[in-house]
Amino acid sequence: MVKLALVVAEFNYDITHLMLQKALEHAKFLGAEVTYVVKVPGVFDIPMVLKELALKEDVDAVVTLGAVIQGATKHDEIVAQQAARKILDLAVESGKPITLGIIGHGANRMQALERVEEYARRAVEAAVKLARRKKLLKEAKYGGSTVVID
């Protein structure tokens, strides 16, 4: 069974709370166990807890959930781009899947609400698939014919 940690931004919590509910439902549907749910103030703060979660033995993958709503300035672009870059850096550094379930940048509140289920489900599904496939890859051995991990 894949063990997941979920990191949820509290900013725009009317949206991210719904994302959390959908993510928990989809994890259960896929047969994954959610071992941690960590709430952080905003999307920009998500990377602050990722390394700690990735080091835990009872976490196979981490799902990030957040919503960056377009404002009057370019602030949403900076937040979303920097968070996404650091999330990927930490995934590569830790060797554990950390998936991006962050709506935005450029989305307005209505668009974000329309994308809640899609983004939450995709992030959970990617985390579960990556965790399972990494385990299969670790156990796989080449024996003269192509090894396919799917």
Curated annotation (Swiss-Prot):
Pathway per the UniProt entry: Cofactor biosynthesis; riboflavin biosynthesis; riboflavin from 2-hydroxy-3-oxobutyl phosphate and 5-amino-6-(D-ribitylamino)uracil: step 1/2
Catalytic activity annotation: (2S)-2-hydroxy-3-oxobutyl phosphate + 5-amino-6-(D-ribitylamino)uracil = 6,7-dimethyl-8-(1-D-ribityl)lumazine + phosphate + 2 H2O + H(+)
Annotated CDD domains: Lumazine_synthase_archaeal
Residues that bind (2S)-2-hydroxy-3-oxobutyl phosphate: A72, T73, R115
InterPro entries reported in the protein's UniProt record: LS (IPR034964), LS/RS (IPR002180), LS/RS_sf (IPR036467)
Gene3D superfamilies: Lumazine/riboflavin synthase (3.40.50.960)
GO molecular function: 6,7-dimethyl-8-ribityllumazine synthase activity
A GO BP entry: riboflavin biosynthetic process
Active-site residues, as the UniProt record annotates them: H75
Enzyme Commission (EC) number: 2.5.1.78
Signal sequence, renumbered to the chain: none
GO cellular component: riboflavin synthase complex
Keywords: Riboflavin biosynthesis, Transferase
One Pfam assignment: DMRL_synthase
Binding site for 5-amino-6-(D-ribitylamino)uracil: F11, V43, F44, D45, A67, V68, I69, L100
Functional description taken from the UniProt entry: Catalyzes the formation of 6,7-dimethyl-8-ribityllumazine by condensation of 5-amino-6-(D-ribitylamino)uracil with 3,4-dihydroxy-2-butanone 4-phosphate. This is the penultimate step in the biosynthesis of riboflavin.
Record NCBIfam families: lumazine-synth
Family: Belongs to the DMRL synthase family.
Name of this protein: 6,7-dimethyl-8-ribityllumazine synthase
Organism: Pyrobaculum calidifontis (strain DSM 21063 / JCM 11548 / VA1)
Gene: ribH
